[in-house]
């Protein structure tokens, strides 16, 4: 094996190791796991998602993009009410994403703003 082939093999191995170790930090939790000390649960979690979605929408710069809502304020309140009601009943199934849910990611673990915005409704083109 030549030196360049060996170097390439070692480099690919290191790259694979780095990728695997960084992607292995996804939040997972058991059903009986207790909330994280810095986790956000219940109604505050629903409010945090709403705030994160509004911030993301604001940062997109008012380019005529909307979150598919006919009446933004009414739909936002309905969405928040639904989240609060489900949080009180401890049902997060509509918020599941790839086998993990928002309760697992942000209540039983600590999540950041990027993770919160992953639960926002999709942005669609529309008129103001």
UniProtKB/Swiss-Prot annotation:
Gene3D superfamilies recorded: Insulin-like
InterPro entries from the UniProt entry: Insulin-like, Insulin-like_sf, Insulin-rel_pep, Insulin_CS, Insulin_family
Keyword match Secreted: yes
Signal listed as a keyword: yes
PROSITE patterns xref list: INSULIN
Its biological purpose: This venom insulin facilitates prey capture by rapidly inducing hypoglycemic shock. Intraperitoneal injection of this peptide into zebrafish lowers blood glucose with the same potency than human insulin. In vivo, when applied to water, this peptide reduces overall locomotor activity of zebrafish larvae, observed as a significant decrease in the percentage of time spent swimming and movement frequency.
Protein name: Con-Ins F1
Organism, scientific name: Conus floridulus
